[in-house]
C-alpha cells in the first residue's frame, strides 16, 4: 500500500522551521541546513518542496501574512464593527512568547522588503489591507474613515514598542482600546446631533 503524504503538512513544518531560524538569526541566517535542523527534517525534504532559499523565504512571507489574516478572521467571528476594529488593531501586539517570535519574524520580513521587491509587494499589500479594513470598519460603524490610517499606524508603533520591550503589552492594548472607545463615543455624539 503506498504511503499517503500530507504535502501541506510537510510544507508547514518546513515553514515553521524557517521562522524559527529567522527569529534566532534573521533572514540572512537562513540556509537549508539550518531550517532542516530547526524543523527536525532532512535537507532533501526541503529541496523537494523549495528550489532555492529565496523561494523558501518568499513562501514563509506569504504564509505569515496568510496565517495572520486567517487568525484575525477566526477571532472576529460574531463581533460587531467596533469589536472587529479593536481585534484588528490589538492582534499584532505580542502578548505571548510564541507570538513575540511571530512578530519578530514579521519585522525581519519588513526589513527584507527594502531589498526584495517580491517581499515588498506582499508586505505593502498586507499593511495597506490593514489600513483599508480599519477604514471599512469605521465606515460600517458610522465613524469618520479618516481615522483608519491613524489607528493602523498607532497599532504598528505600539507593536514595535512592545517588541523592543519599551512598553508592556497590556498598556499597548489599553491605549488602542481607549482610542477606539473615544472614536465610538464621538461617533455616538455625531449621530445624536444629526
Question: What is the meaning of each model-derived region?
Answer:
Residues 7-18, 35, 60-64, 68, ...:
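Generic hydrophobic, amphipathic alpha-helix propensity
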Residues 13, 17-55, 59:
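Helix-turn-helix
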Residues 51-55, 76, 80, 93-97, ...:
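Residues in soluble alpha-helical coiled-coils and helical-bundle/repeat scaffolds
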Residues 59, 70-102, 147-151:
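Hydrophobic alpha-helical connector segments
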Residues 69, 98-107, 114-141, 149:
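Amphipathic alpha-helical packing segments from all-alpha helical-bundle domains
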Residues 89-92, 106-110, 151, 155-158:
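Short alpha-helical scaffolding segments that buttress acidic/His motifs in well-ordered protein cores
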Residues 119-128, 139-194:
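Hydrophobic/aromatic-rich alpha-helical bundle segments in the mid-to-C-terminal region
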